[in-house]
Design a protein with these regions (language model features):
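Membrane-anchoring hydrophobic helices of lipid-metabolizing enzymes
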Residues: 1-70
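Catalytic core of membrane glycerolipid acyltransferases/transacylases, capturing the structured
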Residues: 21-39, 51-53, 69-122
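Active-site phosphate/pyrophosphate- and oxyanion-stabilizing loops and adjacent acidic/basic residues
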Residues: 48, 82, 168-169
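Generic preference for hydrophobic
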Residues: 60, 71, 93-94, 203-205
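Structural alpha-helical scaffold elements that stabilize or flank donor/cofactor-binding regions
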Residues: 63, 108-109, 170
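Residue-level "edge-of-site" marker
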Residues: 63-64, 122, 184
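Pre-Walker A (Motif I) flank of P-loop NTPase domains
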Residues: 66-74, 140-146
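Non-catalytic C-terminal accessory region of glycerolipid acyltransferases
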Residues: 126-243
């Protein structure tokens, strides 16, 4: 039954995505925020499909305050890349440059001035990251970054996917408050997984980390905050499944 429901969702999801991409093409001539509205609609429709076809529900704990800030989120699922269209204010995602090469999707990312990172460029990539993020801050946008740089499986230790220097470079250069985010989305929608499992996905906004910390202390607090809260959410899901 799970396989059938997953197949139905995957078909509906890709159809929904393609429909929005094509319907949104004329908006490339409009202002950037029009594309943001398409992203929010994409996320809402996907959540509706997940609930109706798979039995996956979303719970959000806390919220982001308005204004420019860094948002450092755990990354376990493709779903994470659309949720912040709903949860952040005028989101600017930090994403790998290769995504801009995806037909149509890449045009949307460029039009929204997402922050693209060439992971092969070394120090020059960090400089560009800081410059682009500084421009986003000047527009009052909320910058969402996945500090481990990739999707990680639930339960994986942070040492298997270390926290990358990009978030520390942004914190040091921009001196912005950082909101850590824990989540357990990989339990229901894992990386490159055809199967989607019913359950409750929780996204939790954690206490803000102040801007004035030194790099080492900032990274320690960020990793400790995200990892401990994510482990707690995964335990909660396991307890709920057994009850």
């Amino acid at each position: 039954m799970i396989l059938l429901r997953s197949a139905l969702f995957n078909i509906a999801f890709f159809g929904w995505t393609i429909l929005l991409l094509l319907a949104g093409l004329p908006l490339l001539l409009a202002q950037r925020r029009a594309i943001h509205a398409i992203g929010a609609l994409w996320a809402r429709g996907t959540l509706l499909l997940l609930r109706a076809l798979v039995g996956i529900r979303l719970e959000v704990r806390g919220a982001l305050a308005p204004g420019a800030r860094l948002v450092a989120a755990k990354h376990q699922s493709a779903l994470d890349t659309m949720l912040f269209y709903l949860l952040a204010h005028d989101v600017a995602y930090v994403m790998k440059q290769e995504l801009a090469a995806i037909p149509i999707y890449g045009l949307f990312a460029l039009h929204q001035r997402m922050i693209l990172v060439d992971r092969k460029a070394g120090a020059s990539a960090l400089k560009k990251l800081v410059a682009d993020a500084s421009a986003a801050r000047g527009e009052g946008r909320q910058i969402v970054i996945f500090p481990q740089g990739t999707r990680t499986p639930p339960g994986a230790p942070a040492s298997a996917h270390p926290y990358q220097p990009g978030i520390a470079a942004l914190q040091h250069a921009l001196r912005m408050p950082t909101t850590p985010v824990a989540l357990n989305s990989g339990l229901c929608w894992g990386r490159r997984s055809f199967v989607k499992r019913p359950g409750r996905i929780v996204v939790e906004f954690l206490p803000e980390i102040p801007a004035a910390l030194q790099r080492a202390e900032f990274m320690r607090r960020l990793e400790e905050s995200i990892e401990s809260a994510t482990a707690r959410l995964e335990r909660e899901a396991g307890d709920a499944a057994r009850s």
